[in-house]
Regions:
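Short proline/glycine- and polar residue-rich coil/turn motifs
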Residues: 87-94, 211-220
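Short, solvent-exposed loop/turn segments enriched in Ser/Thr/Gly
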Residues: 25-31, 95-96, 108-115, 173-177
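N-terminal signal peptide c-region/cleavage motif recognized by signal peptidases
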Residues: 6-8
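Short, hydrophobic/aromatic beta-strand segments
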Residues: 40-48, 55-59, 110-111, 161-162, ...
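Surface-exposed binding patches on compact interaction domains or structured appendages
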Residues: 12-15, 41-99, 201
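Asparagine-centered strand-capping/turn motif at beta-strand->loop junctions
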Residues: 34-40, 101, 181-185
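Terminal connector regions
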Residues: 49-52, 102-151, 230-269
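Beta-sheet-dominated interaction scaffolds and their linkers
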Residues: 11-42, 47-49, 86, 161-172
């Protein structure tokens, strides 16, 4: 049984930090800490692949993977190595994994990407509802895979986004917001999108917020709950702000860029 989990969750009892890795060309190294707080050992394997987040046709987020990246892709997969790559992490044991970069000598300035995979095996989940008169219990062995973004920065790096096609609609008891974001510069854009629906008196009646990672372009769709009593008919304005800040990342890891603001009138019949 294989499960894909966010890093904030326990991967088969193994805790992983940090949940995003950025390596500078001057040091060419990074690290990852694994900790097993459980009572059973966990077999850990590390690997990497090239991929980046995109939006699907409905506006949801998904990870696009490229098995054999072409030369024009900024892939760091072939020259980032983890030490050790395999280990048995005992109960209450902590392990530091070193990440070493050996980029080509002619590497151009910019940002290069990889996805680090931490695969943890160990433990089991009992299968309920399986009757056995002999008293034999049934359980599934678990394998949990955690995917962590890795970015390698060399020389002058810059980023930003352009926003377009802002759209909004009231769908049942929610506000649905969608827009297109195109990245500028030579590095992924890490930021936060915030939206606020205000009435004619300037009162905020609904808000939406989401972290962003724009590697090329995307058209995310976000929803926010509306007041339980509903909204009266009339004109409202949606105000959207996209800023290069993230609550889940240290400020020094987020490349600064000018904020983007847009607005749209929303009419309720």
């Amino acid at each position: 049984m294989v499960m894909l989990l966010p890093v904030a969750l326990r991967a088969q009892g193994v805790l992983i930090a940090p949940h995003a890795i950025i390596i500078d060309h001057r040091t060419r190294s990074g690290s990852l800490t694994l900790y097993n707080p459980g009572d059973e050992p966990a077999e850990i394997t590390l690997s990497s692949f090239f991929g980046y987040p995109v939006s699907d046709p409905s506006g949801g987020f998904e990870l696009k993977t490229v098995d054999q990246p072409e030369p024009d892709y900024p892939s760091a997969v072939k020259w980032i190595e983890a030490f050790p790559k395999r280990m048995l992490l005992g109960p209450k044991q902590r392990q530091t994994v070193r990440l070493l970069a050996k980029p080509p000598a002619n590497l151009q300035d910019g940002e290069y990407w990889a996805r680090l995979v931490v695969n943890a095996k160990g433990g089991s989940v009992p299968v309920e509802g399986v009757a056995d008169s002999s008293g034999v219990s049934v359980a599934l062995a678990l394998e949990v895979r955690t995917i962590i973004p890795l970015q390698y920065r060399k020389g002058k790096v810059a980023t930003g986004v352009r926003a377009s096609r802002l759209d909004a609609a009231i769908e049942h008891d929610s506000l649905a917001v969608r827009l297109r974001l195109d990245r500028t510069g030579n590095a992924a854009y890490l930021g936060t999108l915030r939206g606020a629906l205000v009435d004619s008196a300037g009162k905020v009646v609904a808000t939406v917020s989401s972290p962003l990672a724009v590697y090329y372009d995307m058209e995310p769709r976000l929803t926010a709950p509306l007041p339980a009593a509903g909204l009266p008919a009339g004109r409202y304005r949606l105000k959207v702000d996209v800023a290069s800040e993230r609550q889940d990342l240290p400020p020094n890891l987020v490349l600064a860029s000018p904020p983007i603001r847009d607005s749209l009138e929303v009419r309720l019949p």
